[in-house]
């Protein structure tokens, strides 16, 4: 099961391995668990002032290697893991903003972390 918990946002999916991603909006970080064991902690950016990142337990419903935002001027969203409507975990080139709120609501991660997460979720 793969699970995403934002702030506590939790993300799970039925799978070979139990994958759980726990996003802390307070700490602007994501803990990655596999079969209950913490395997990584990565910096993230959630919604900046005036925007909202949803809180709750979610399951991924769509994975897209390259998605372009329909809402924000075709902004590229590499390695998108959609969990609630248009909200996704995806790569950002603005890695200097990671660790603080900076998004329109999605959970932004570094390009290398997004590739790791995408494969982890895709394979499980």
Tell where the protein language model's regions lie, with residue ranges:
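General beta-strand recognition
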Residues: 29-31, 59, 88
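Short, surface-exposed loop motifs enriched in S/T, G, D/E and P with embedded aromatic residues
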Residues: 43-44, 58-60
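Exported/periplasmic cell-wall-interacting domains
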Residues: 18, 48-57, 64-124
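Sec-dependent signal peptide recognition
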Residues: 1-7
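N-terminal signal peptide c-region/cleavage motif recognized by signal peptidases
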Residues: 12-14
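A structural motif detector for short, solvent-exposed N-terminal "entry" segments of globular domains
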Residues: 16-49
């Amino acid at each position: 099961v793969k699970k995403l918990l934002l702030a506590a946002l939790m993300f799970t999916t039925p799978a070979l391995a139990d994958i759980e991603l726990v996003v802390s909006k307070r700490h602007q970080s994501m803990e990655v668990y596999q079969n209950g064991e913490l395997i990584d902690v990565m910096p993230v950016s959630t919604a900046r002032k005036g925007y909202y990142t949803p809180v709750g337990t979610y399951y991924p419903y769509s994975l897209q290697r390259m998605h372009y935002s329909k809402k924000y001027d075709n902004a590229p969203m590499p390695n998108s893991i959609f969990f609630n409507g248009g909200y996704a975990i995806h790569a950002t080139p603005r890695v200097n903003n990671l660790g603080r709120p900076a998004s329109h609501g999605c959970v932004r991660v570094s390009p290398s972390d997004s590739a790791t997460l995408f494969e982890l979720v895709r394979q499980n």
